[in-house]
Amino acid sequence: MRAKITSVIVNNFYVYIYDLKIETKAIPKGIFKHDSHELKPMVGDDIEVELVDGVYLIVKIYDRYNQLIRPKVANVDIVLVVASIVQPDLNTLTLNKYLAFYEARNVKNVAIGLSKYDLASDSLKQKVDQLILDYQRNNYKVFVLTNEHDISLLKKFIKKHTLCLAGNSGVGKSTLINKLDPSIKQRTQEISQFLNRGKHTTTSTKLISFANGFLVDTPGFGNLEVNLTKNEMANAFSDFANYARFCKFSNCLHIDEPHCAIKKAVNDDQIVNWRYDDYLKIMKKLPNDVLEIKTRNQNKK
């Protein structure tokens, strides 16, 4: 039977079995391997279970299409990065760090949720509206979380998917969760009781049934530590991808290299200046890679 691991506490695995629509305990049957390496079951894993003598056994772990470290979870379909317009003030540098980090981790859909728009001044709203247009121009989905129409669109977007909310403390993630599914608070308490969560497990990740899919519940998960290399970051800005392939060097960092297609795109107003400026600020704080300059074959003369 197809199932998904919803929580791991010490060596106890809790799984949701789709056909039976139940959450129950399961134990691994032996050791799993992938590419000759031991594969340990983790939250978010899609698995196969069998009932043997009244005990559910995990007999197979399906291939993961992504894996996050913080929070520790696999197979996330959507990351919604929540940022507030005010209280705290919007910081595009922080927002772009989140976007790049999760795109580098192969999350297919990384979207933006803007909270507290209704508290902004008219002049600030005008700036935010332009910001939204800039992100949308680069194919990001942006939801204004105080707009009921956008909330309706967001509900459709996340339906039947595994959703992870990211963003700093105080930006309104809890408010959004309750708006998307008012019953979530009660069910979260019920699940916590079911799992016997104590103080030593308050930072463990778990999946909660949500919007016909799952919500990644990550207590204690707040600020993001960007642990990408400069090479990884150079490939993490999705709006750079269409231009980066025309850079002279295949491992171009888009900083001061000659014949950089990204810098040309910025000068031609194909990539917005403020996003490129944030990219440069992020790159300055990352450790240097040991680089071998690689020229693209098609550009060699």
Curated annotation (Swiss-Prot):
Coiled coil start-end: none
Residues involved in Zn(2+) binding: C247, C252, H254, C260
Enzyme class, broadest EC rank: hydrolase
Subcellular location: Cytoplasm
Protein keywords: Cytoplasm, GTP-binding, Hydrolase, Metal-binding, Nucleotide-binding, Ribosome biogenesis, RNA-binding, rRNA-binding, Zinc
Any one GO CC term of the record: cytoplasm
Main location, first listed in the record: cytoplasm
GO MF annotation terms: GTP binding; GTPase activity; metal ion binding; rRNA binding
Any GO BP: ribosomal small subunit biogenesis
Keyword presence, Hydrolase: yes
Cofactor mode of binding and number, as noted: Binds 1 zinc ion per subunit.
Domain of life per record: Bacteria
Keyword presence, Metal-binding: yes
The CP-type G domain, residue ranges: 65-224
Role noted for this protein: One of several proteins that assist in the late maturation steps of the functional core of the 30S ribosomal subunit. Helps release RbfA from mature subunits. May play a role in the assembly of ribosomal proteins into the subunit. Circularly permuted GTPase that catalyzes slow GTP hydrolysis, GTPase activity is stimulated by the 30S ribosomal subunit.
PANTHER family: SMALL RIBOSOMAL SUBUNIT BIOGENESIS GTPASE RSGA, SMALL RIBOSOMAL SUBUNIT BIOGENESIS GTPASE RSGA 1, MITOCHONDRIAL-RELATED
Subunit structure as annotated in this protein's UniProt entry: Monomer. Associates with 30S ribosomal subunit, binds 16S rRNA.
Entry protein name: Small ribosomal subunit biogenesis GTPase RsgA
